[in-house]
Amino acid sequence: MYELIQVSELCYYIQSPAKIGVVKTAGNDVVLIDSGNHKTAGKKALKLLEQNGWRLRAVFNTHSHADHIGGNRFLQEHTGCKIYAPGIERDFTCHPVLEPTFLYGGCPPSELRHKFLMAQDSNTLPLTPDALPDGMEAIPLPGHSFDMVGFRTKDNIVFLADCLSSRETLDKYRVSFLTDVKACLETLERVMDMDAAVFVPSHAETTADIRALAQYNIDKVHEIADDILDICREPVGFERILQGLFDKYGLSMNFEQYALVGSTVRSYLSWLKECGGLRAFFENNALLWEKV
């Protein structure tokens, strides 16, 4: 863990729970793509940079989830680097309490106010094309998070952030977090058509051919949707839908899973309703969902 792995002449990644991209820009200057899941990750990343004689100029966050921005504040305090994040991800990075608040749908209890869901805040700037090094471009990858992006470097390495997960992760945890099912599927379809020398997903192995994994992720989204429709053959409320999925997949409920999977299931319900697969109605002061 926290091994520096070279991908191309200019690009590396630090193997960690969420890969940290390292891109050489000019001379001994480098930028990072994400900063890891905690200040410890930031410390280890900085140590690797210093061992190679590199100077950190900026961190480009793909999105605002805590496992990608956890090292921001440490790196900023110890190097003075600038930090950038796209769209609404910047607001969540500046104000991390928004993350558990969004997931829970209200003021989050103490069980959701921890480093895995709520990183330390950092002074974060809007990600614009002018902020990127020459030859580096941001690629919109919404779905997993609101305004998530990936990055393509000048030597055609594509960092894919969290737009897809490994087969092992999908098979083990079943429900992969997302905020927008439609956007997620559209992103995966675009990824299927991408070319790169190497793709670097944050939570899967690097590869020169991403198509099979992207298709596997697409299939899993539709599988979950089908399971939700099956649960909704009779009118049923959200809590029962969530319980039914946990029972079917052999998952164990706790506050964190309730928030993460619950938020994701609500996104599926919205998508299925808009697609015409579910109808929603109120009965006896309860919101019920039923397969059409």
Which residue ranges define each predicted feature?
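Conserved beta-strand hairpin/beta-sheet module of binuclear metal-dependent hydrolase folds
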Residues: 1-52, 150-162
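Divalent metal-coordination and catalytic microenvironments
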Residues: 10, 23, 34, 49, ...
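Hydrophobic/aromatic beta-strand patches that form the interior of the parallel beta-sheet core
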Residues: 12, 60, 84, 125-127, ...
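A short catalytic or substrate-binding loop motif that flags glycine-/basic-rich loops and adjacent residues
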Residues: 14-16, 132, 141-145
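A structural signal for the main folded, soluble domain(s) of proteins
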Residues: 29, 43, 50, 70, ...
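Active-site HxH/HxHxD metal-binding segment of metal-dependent hydrolases
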Residues: 40-132
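C-terminal regulatory/interaction regions
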Residues: 230-292
